[in-house]
């Protein structure tokens, strides 16, 4: 497929909201033993559950390495397409393409540079060259032309849009030293506006407490629909998360979007702090150059890290009393969707959650 020397804005394409209609969803099969415990077997079961839940609402493609293709095909339901593709890890939200659409129904991919969430400064593993090719390969599978930004680092989990000209992100991530230190905040805004066709960017300060991706916005904030947003929250003022969420709430409550609307902010309480157990820590291979999983480390658990499908919402369950409160809140926010919970601790142990391991392809 073509690599286009232009931009989404010049060509009349925009990034749609995740709540708009999808043609399908991509997931990468987990396997690396220095990130997923017990050879990724528990995580693979969780990924199967997520893929199966989403496949009730839209077509799902799972890509797996050559060494895991047969295993993935065996474990996944027949209606889920499985395709062989090299990768370094299973975070397609971040390594995959950001799709844009135009008014004629055409779809293109934006292929950002990927450097493992910080490159040689504070990246989570090395090398990452296979992951940096994932976006192009998915565009090829989908027969979609792409824009390639080889000199601009961005992960899909660091942005959320309303599809009507507004993007929300965090300074903690986009202004981090390991992403685009050669660019000013204003220059980063210019790139985002040009390639996603935006009019306004709302900057939150920080993401979820101890988020190892430098505070990805998709773990603390999501767009329900234009003008209506969901925010991770805690009522415990002694929790470090409280200060962060309160700061986000104050920013969002005093902002307007590209259309001049005040934002309607809905709070969804996070679970009680979830810590890595001794057994979970010992199940991860220790490898130099990758982030260790230590007993007692707090995980960045949030119900906001959910996936919005066609007529469905798939959200993480943590075995916490707030699981059911989150389910009820999501039902209220998405009255026309079926809300499905999936046990997601094994995904959380790897450093993210359901939104992080999925990437939607818009219908156009």
From Swiss-Prot:
Keyword Transmembrane helix: no
Gene Ontology molecular function: any one: protein-arginine deiminase activity
EC number: 3.5.3.12
UniProt enzyme class: hydrolase
Enzyme active site: 356 (amidino-cysteine intermediate)
Assigned keywords, A-Z: Hydrolase
Protein's UniProt keywords contain Hydrolase: yes
Catalyzed reaction equations: agmatine + H2O = N-carbamoylputrescine + NH4(+)
InterPro entries xrefs: Agmatine_deiminase, Peptidyl-Arg-deiminase_porph
Domain of life: Bacteria
Family: Belongs to the agmatine deiminase family.
NCBIfam families referenced in this protein's UniProt entry, alphabetically: agmatine_aguA, PRK13551.1
Protein name (Swiss-Prot/TrEMBL): Putative agmatine deiminase 1
């Amino acid at each position: 497929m073509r690599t286009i020397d232009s931009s989404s804005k010049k060509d009349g394409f925009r990034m749609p909201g995740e709540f708009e209609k999808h043609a399908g969803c991509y997931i990468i099969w987990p396997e690396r033993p220095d990130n997923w415990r017990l050879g990724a077997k528990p995580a693979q079961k969780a990924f199967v559950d997520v893929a199966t839940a989403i496949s009730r609402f839209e077509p799902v493609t799972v890509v797996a390495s050559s060494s895991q293709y047969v295993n993935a095909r065996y474990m996944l339901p027949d209606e889920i397409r499985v395709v062989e593709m090299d990768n370094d890890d299973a975070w397609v939200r971040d390594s995959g393409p950001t799709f844009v659409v135009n008014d004629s129904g055409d779809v293109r991919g934006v292929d950002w540079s990927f450097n493992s969430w910080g490159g040689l400064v504070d990246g989570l593993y090395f090398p990452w060259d296979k992951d940096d090719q994932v976006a192009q390969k998915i565009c090829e599978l989908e027969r979609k032309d792409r824009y390639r930004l080889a000199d601009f680092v961005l992960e899909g989990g660091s942005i959320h849009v309303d599809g009507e000209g507004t993007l929300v992100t965090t300074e903690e991530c986009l202004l981090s030293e390991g992403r685009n230190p050669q660019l000013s905040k204003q220059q980063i805004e210019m790139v985002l506006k040009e390639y996603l066709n935006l009019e306004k960017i709302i900057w939150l300060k920080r993401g979820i407490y101890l988020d190892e991706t430098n505070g990805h916005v998709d773990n603390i904030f999501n767009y329900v629909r234009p003008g209506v947003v969901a925010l991770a929250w805690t009522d415990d003022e002694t929790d470090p998360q409280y200060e962060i969420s309160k700061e986000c709430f104050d920013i969002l409550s005093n902002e307007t979007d590209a259309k001049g609307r005040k934002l309607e902010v809905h709070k969804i309480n996070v679970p009680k702090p979830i810590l890595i157990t001794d057994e979970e820590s010992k199940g991860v291979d220790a490898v130099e150059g990758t982030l260790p999983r230590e007993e007692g480390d707090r995980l960045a658990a949030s119900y906001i890290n959910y996936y919005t499908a066609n007529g469905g919402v798939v959200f993480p369950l943590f075995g916490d009393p707030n699981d059911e409160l989150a389910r009820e809140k999501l039902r209220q926010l998405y009255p026309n969707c079926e809300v499905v919970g999936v046990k997601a601790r094994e995904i959380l142990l790897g450093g993210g959650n359901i939104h992080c391991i999925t990437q939607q392809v818009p219908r156009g």
